Curated annotation (Swiss-Prot):
InterPro entries: WD40/YVTN_repeat-like_dom_sf, WD40_repeat_dom_sf, WD40_rpt. GO terms for cellular component: nucleus. Belongs to the WD repeat ASA1 family. GO terms for biological process: chromatin organization. This is ASTRA-associated protein 1. It is found in: Nucleus. It comes from Debaryomyces hansenii (strain ATCC 36239 / CBS 767 / BCRC 21394 / JCM 1990 / NBRC 0083 / IGC 2968) (Yeast). Component of the ASTRA chromatin remodeling machinery complex. SUPFAM superfamilies: WD40 repeat-like. WD repeats lie at residues 11-52, 55-93, 132-176, 313-352, 362-399, 441-476. Gene3D superfamilies: YVTN repeat-like/Quinoprotein amine dehydrogenase (2.130.10.10). The lineage of its organism: Eukaryota, Fungi, Dikarya, Ascomycota, Saccharomycotina. The keyword Lyase does not apply. Component of the ASTRA complex involved in chromatin remodeling. Keywords: Chromatin regulator, Nucleus, Repeat, WD repeat.
Length: 476
């Protein structure tokens, strides 16, 4: 099996940092972001943008479709933004131009001068912005953020080793409200220290077993400062998330929201609201009236407990996490050569400190990105190499995007002929894309049949992005 290259998308002038398949009404498209804050929403079939805008002034670290057409971005400019992309009808379809590339639109110039003789108003006129809301966040490291069911996990405001949990939306039946009016930012858990949580968990387990021993900082066996900074965070479900750390530890956390709920009434109310997955845009996120029990929420943080720990990747930092929903496992990649598989516990009443797990030596270091579907596992490495495996980890293919270059002559004598050398391009992400459902062709005219035949989104696709600003799409 070898992937078939279908096309290459070119438009970014900077290193691509994130890509995200974007689903609307059962149709798949692609969103990409780069190191200068530019965002492009691509039509995969036409190979052209649906919309282009400058979303941030710095490197975009997280790009995530959270639900119903809303797009979340997180950047090193200390902002998280949520964009209503689907309902944006007046966006630019022009590629970013060099004169606009480095304009700092969202920051205030200290000297009051405009960058590259281009005004911010000119940039906004050329590339209008979708409706959006802004959430300030810690940008001291390169850890991503993740979202599930109105809740957001981010590195803590004051310490990148710790994390915060936010509630960012309050359900409302007023669908005509703006996105900004619906934002209800609330930090429900602040500066959660994993090391203190670990000490508390182990101490409690020791007491239950009759062992009088408490972990102290002076006996810390870790080579780094405790677990180090957060590297990757991943929600598995609404009340369960995993964080990969600089030390190589993978830790699972369970959120118990029941402690923050009190006074449940048996009478159902018809004016309560929950997201409707069948309705797109803001109306789907906030506009579905359903019956539910009236609950009074008291001002109490949810209970977060540590339920899993594994150090199989230590001492290498964890740089990639993905969830395999078919096997209910977390797949973890690090700066080393080993890919590890972690079974998610079936119940969370007991802490699982597991020293062993399934691991595979891929014989190549720097596991930058991992993606999986029902039959294929794809791993991308720092240096641009992509490997494909079946679910039993038998290697199926290798691919490396090469950039031809001419070797430098050793002398000016003219005796040595220049030789062409192959130089690999640094990889950013690999993504396996769930194909569209094949539509029945309602018309038998030639144009409709050709359009249906050329629709590549009905097949299994592999999308790889690179630091030269290109995106390559394969059929797998």
């Amino acid at each position: 099996m070898k992937p078939i290259e279908l096309c290459t998308l070119r438009g970014h002038l900077n290193d691509i940092t994130c890509t995200e398949p974007y689903y609307i009404g059962g149709k798949v498209s692609l969103v990409s972001a780069d190191s200068n804050g530019w965002i492009i929403w691509w039509d995969i079939n036409t190979r052209r943008p649906n919309c282009v805008w400058k979303g941030h002034d710095s490197n975009i670290v997280t790009l995530r479709q959270i639900c119903n057409g809303l797009l979340l971005t997180h950047s090193k400019d200390s902002d998280i933004k949520i964009w209503d992309v689907e309902n944006f009808k007046s966006g630019s379809r022009e590629m970013p131009a060099e004169k606009y590339n480095n304009v700092q639109y969202f920051s205030i110039d200290r000297d009051g001068e405009e960058d590259n003789n281009v005004s911010k108003n000119e940039l906004l006129e050329a590339f209008p912005l979708p409706e959006n809301v802004v959430i300030p966040v810690n940008a001291l490291n390169y850890c991503n953020v993740d979202y599930s069911n109105h809740h957001l996990i981010t590195p803590a405001t004051t310490d990148s080793n710790n994390f915060d949990l936010y509630s960012i939306f309050k359900p409302s039946h007023q669908t005509d409200e703006s996105l900004e009016a619906k934002l209800n930012l609330k930090r429900v858990a602040a500066n959660i220290d994993p090391w203190k949580l670990y000490k508390k968990t182990i101490t409690q387990l020791n007491k239950e077993q009759g062992v009088e021993f408490e972990i102290g900082n002076e006996n810390d066996i870790l080579k780094r400062d405790k677990f180090g900074i957060m590297m990757k965070v991943l929600f598995v479900r609404d009340d369960l998330f995993y964080i990969g750390y600089e030390s190589g530890h993978l830790i699972g956390y369970h959120i118990d929201f029941s402690g923050a709920i009190n006074n449940e009434n048996e009478g159902a109310k018809s004016d309560s609201v929950k997201p409707d997955k069948n309705v797109s845009g803001l109306a789907g996120l906030f506009g579905n009236k359903t019956k539910s029990f009236d609950k009074t929420i008291i001002n109490k943080d949810p209970h977060i407990k540590m339920i899993y720990m594994n150090d199989s990747c230590s001492p290498y930092p964890i740089i990639s996490l993905v969830y395999d929903n078919k096997e209910n496992k977390i797949i973890c990649g690090s700066a080393g050569k080993q890919l590890t598989f972690h079974k998610i516990p079936e119940e969370f009443s007991q802490f699982n400190d597991i020293s062993d797990c399934k691991r595979y030596n891929l014989r190549h270091s720097g596991i930058q990105s991992v993606s999986i579907n029902n039959s294929l596992l794809v791993v991308g490495f720092w240096d641009g190499l992509i490997k494909g495996y079946d679910l039993d980890l038998n290697e199926l293919f290798k691919y490396c995007k090469r950039l031809p270059r001419i070797d430098v002559l050793e002398s000016n004598s003219g005796q040595q002929q220049p030789r062409e050398k192959q130089n690999s391009i640094k990889l950013c992400t690999v993504k396996l894309v769930i194909p569209n459902e094949t539509d029945v062709v309602k018309s038998n005219d030639y144009k409709s049949l050709i359009k249906h035949k050329r629709d590549i989104t009905t097949t299994n696709l592999l999308i790889s992005s690179y630091y030269d600003g290109t995106i390559t799409i394969f059929k797998v």
